[in-house]
Amino acid sequence: MAYRKRGARREANINNNDRMQEKDDEKQDQNNRMQLSDKVLSKKEEVVTDSQEEIKIADEVKKSTKEESKQLLEVLKTKEEHQKEIQYEILQKTIPTFEPKESILKKLEDIKPEQAKKQTKLFRIFEPRQLPIYRANGEKELRNRWYWKLKKDTLPDGDYDVREYFLNLYDQVLTEMPDYLLLKDMAVENKNSRDAGKVVDSETASICDAIFQDEETEGAVRRFIAEMRQRVQADRNVVNYPSILHPIDYAFNEYFLQHQLVEPLNNDIIFNYIPERIRNDVNYILNMDRNLPSTARYIRPNLLQDRLNLHDNFESLWDTITTSNYILARSVVPDLKELVSTEAQIQKMSQDLQLEALTIQSETQFLTGINSQAANDCFKTLIAAMLSQRTMSLDFVTTNYMSLISGMWLLTVVPNDMFIRESLVACQLAIVNTIIYPAFGMQRMHYRNGDPQRPFQIAEQQIQNFQVANWLHFVNNNQFRQVVIDGVLNQVLNDNIRNGHVINQLMEALMQLSRQQFPTMPVDYKRSIQRGILLLSNRLGQLVDLTRLLAYNYETLMACVTMNMQHVQTLTTEKLQLTSVTSLCMLIGNATVIPSPQTLFHYYNVNVNFHSNYNERINDAVAIITGANRLNLYQKKMKAIVEDFLKRLHIFDVARVPDDQMYRLRDRLRLLPVEVRRLDIFNLILMNMDQIERASDKIAQGVIIAYRDMQLERDEMYGYVNIARNLDGFQQINLEELMRTGDYAQITNMLLNNQPVALVGALPFVTDSSVISLIANVDATVFAQIVKLRKVDTLKPILYKINSDSNDFYLVANYDWVPTSTTKVYKQVPQQFDFRNSMHMLTSNLTFTVYSDLLAFVSADTVEPINAVAFDNMRIMNEL
């Protein structure tokens, strides 16, 4: 019973569970229905998404359909769509464009001939100054006296002596030395004149004013000032102007007037100023204005050649000068016009290569990097590099056969010297091992680094085929010819390149290579090379034209180069990508481009101005070095002179030039002769050093030293000071002798015997290497009393108003008390200003006009570019 009951209960439970499950299902269905009805009736928006599994299946279906459509598209692609793919690939492989350094170009173009600056005043070292007069008791009188003093009386701080002061003065004279003086331009009205007369310059007028207003001026002098005026001799085109000058200043200005650099200007001079090749070029039509006045003048530019030979052992300097020339040349090379449409050309190349659909063939690389910007960039780079003699380096991918075939044209047209050897060897080796040797079934060339022969030279000996060997021989011997034209060394291209005949030689070699069997290479390889050669050979006519165009533009611009074209490998190189050479070969059209006359004249003017400035700065530096040697400035740092020389050339970053090149440059400058005018000016200064020293407030003619205190003496110009005006009664020793021998025993003995010693020779008042410091360092025990146990540097024998123990500069007011000192400055009296001795008449031309830009008189035009002819009297571009 129990068992049965248990079983019955189990069955009952199962039945109950089933019923419960059914009820739950019914409830769930009802709920679902309720939710659906609610969703339908509700205004809320809900996003219903599929389950993840369904999404995955849908994605797979989409992927499969996409793949199928892709395959269909690849098969059915039109040439236009294919072209777009190629274009996209080109965009991915961008060619770096040249970014000109605007600052360098501006520096070059801003160099103007300094001769053109107008002089507004005469050159002066001295000026008259009023100084008070002191009575015997030290009181200042109301009267004044006029003395000649230096205008710029500045001694720089530091280790500096009087001879160096004179060297600086000489440098200042060279900087201010005018190349011409036209007194009419600087003349000003004399305010005190009776009949509105003029004096030579504003400084003369101001001196006249000051003297006229001075109460102590004599009546005769005032009357003379009232009569001062210019005297004109119109028949001789001459004018005389009154001037007030120190005799030394008069000597300077008279010399400048007699040695002016201006020369008469006429049409023949302008005609001969234009480079001869441009004058004789039938493509340029030049006309000149015939209305030049008889008073026209010009300053002949200084275009001496090769005095420093910067190309020889001056790597940094040569690199800088060629870089600036390269940037200038690029700015004047004309832009190519009417290039073949990139899209059309790539489409045509695709047809020639039979690239109807994208394949994984090496030919697809042939089309990469082709664009008009790269073609124009390549054209400018080649011409500018040859003009400036900048070394180029080649960038290429060995697997891009089209680049290498274009490189064969490049090596045919551009001489080997223009490429850095490592880059040239790599390119030649790639051409030999990729194209030439495989064509004849020869083994790869294993080139040893450092081999004196280049790969093409080795290949020339091993290739039996005449046409290929003949082309290799031409490339191996492709060098610039050095020709002197108008006194300038020019690097001229081979005649076969100038007339374009060499391209036929190249094509013969290429056709021979394309006919070979490539026995050791697969068929695809042979076909790729042949198709690449076909692409280039299809443009035979355009390549001949391109070569002629390149040579013509190079030679026309070369006519405007005024400095010798020395070829030496440069430290840095200009990069040239072979893909851009391919662009140039494939896109060159039939439009001729030649430099405009305005561009040529601009290029010529910039070259002339730089060259002339370069020579003038050399003359200055040589003169300063000679002056330093004549002044016995053994300790003068010559490097500073060379640095100044380079700074004045504007284009050099002087701080980065290595020291060894600085000293080599100094040695070269030392060997050059001094220009006559600069030598004469130095001799004028040397003859008058004593007068200049006297006029300075900071240069003394000696110093007196003693153990015992010396009384201050009355001086008419300064009152009671430690200044001695004569050396009567003093033992004298020459400072130059003392410094040269270094023997101080004589001074020591005198001082021990209480005898004052006068050291005679020019010395600055304030200097860290003064004579007293020098002597005191020799024997501190003997000279302890002189330096009074103070720092040597603080002992400055300058015009003490009280005594050397005081830093204050009070005038002496207590006449009963006489202060003393242990040092005296020996100073000679400066030259007194005497109006009659300072009045000079200066003579110059009444009037003339200096023209700096001679080419402004020339109006120029060109023939229609399509009719432009090359040196052989045939059109530059024949393929129309």
From Swiss-Prot:
**Where can this protein be found?**
Virion
The name of this protein is Inner capsid protein VP2
User: Domain description from the entry?
Assistant: The N-terminus binds RNA. It is necessary for encapsidation of VP1 and VP3. The N-termini of 10 VP2 molecules form a cylindrical hub underneath each 5-fold axis of the inner capsid.
InterPro entries the UniProt entry points to: Rotavirus_VP2
The record's subunit annotation is:
Homodecamer; each decamer is made up of two conformers of VP2, called VP2A and VP2B. Interacts with a VP1-VP3 complex. Interacts with the intermediate capsid protein VP6. Interacts with NSP5. Interacts (via N-terminus) with NSP2.
Protein purpose: Inner capsid protein that self-assembles to form an icosahedral capsid with a T=2 symmetry, which consists of 120 copies of VP2, with channels at each of its five-fold vertices. This capsid constitutes the innermost concentric layer of the viral mature particle. It encapsidates the polymerase VP1, the capping enzyme VP3 and the genomic dsRNA, thereby defining the core.
List residue numbers at the site (Interaction with the intermediate capsid protein VP6).
Answer: A220, F224, M228, M839, M841
